[in-house]
Amino acid sequence: QAASLPLALRGQDLIAQASTGSGKTAAFGLALLARLNPRRFAVQALVLCPTRELADQVATEVRRLARAEENIKVVTLCGGVPLRGQIASLEHGAHIVVGTPGRVMDHLERGSLTLEALNTLVLDEADRMLDMGFFDDIARLAGACPPIRQTLLFSATYPEGIARLAARFLRKP
């Protein structure tokens, strides 16, 4: 956390090997909040997580970190929850979206989510997302983001798939 935060705050792309419970959510949460414009009601940060449980934990932590700021809206998009409520939440304006690749992809395809204002993409537990077969969804989501953005990749392990992801989506990590 201490090593990644200064780089992340400078807007650099980052690959960090971090296990669960290492404080990485605080590190990337502070970094994405630093880049956020609360007066712009558009999705400016997207955090992809492998599971609904992790997405819920991350969203809770980011909301806690955002309490110091005025009116920052965090929306969680995961499967197993009705789409209708999620669409309504997005229509009311969201600054940060935390979710699983499949459900975030659903919203992108439906047009209920747009990413053109995005400045930070976080891949949390990227190795687990690859193990679960999400490479194509991650690739499509990253392709829908503006090319000029910060990408932060966190992974407990560093398999070949992570190297491929990093080579494709990160700039000078």
Please give the residue ranges for each predicted region.
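Conserved pre-motif I regulatory segment
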Residues: 1-17
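Motif I (Walker A/P-loop) of helicase-class P-loop NTPases
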Residues: 5, 24-34, 59
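Walker A/P-loop
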Residues: 12-30
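Residues at the beta-strand->loop junction immediately N-terminal to the Walker
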Residues: 15-18, 48-49, 155
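Short glycine-rich anion-binding loops that position phosphate/pyrophosphate groups of nucleotides
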Residues: 21-22, 102-104, 127-128
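Conserved nucleic-acid-binding Ia/Ib motif block in the N-terminal RecA-like helicase ATPase lobe
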Residues: 40-109, 117-120, 163-167
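Post-DEXD/H (motif II) to motif III coupling segment of the RecA-like Helicase ATP-binding lobe
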Residues: 114-123, 127-173
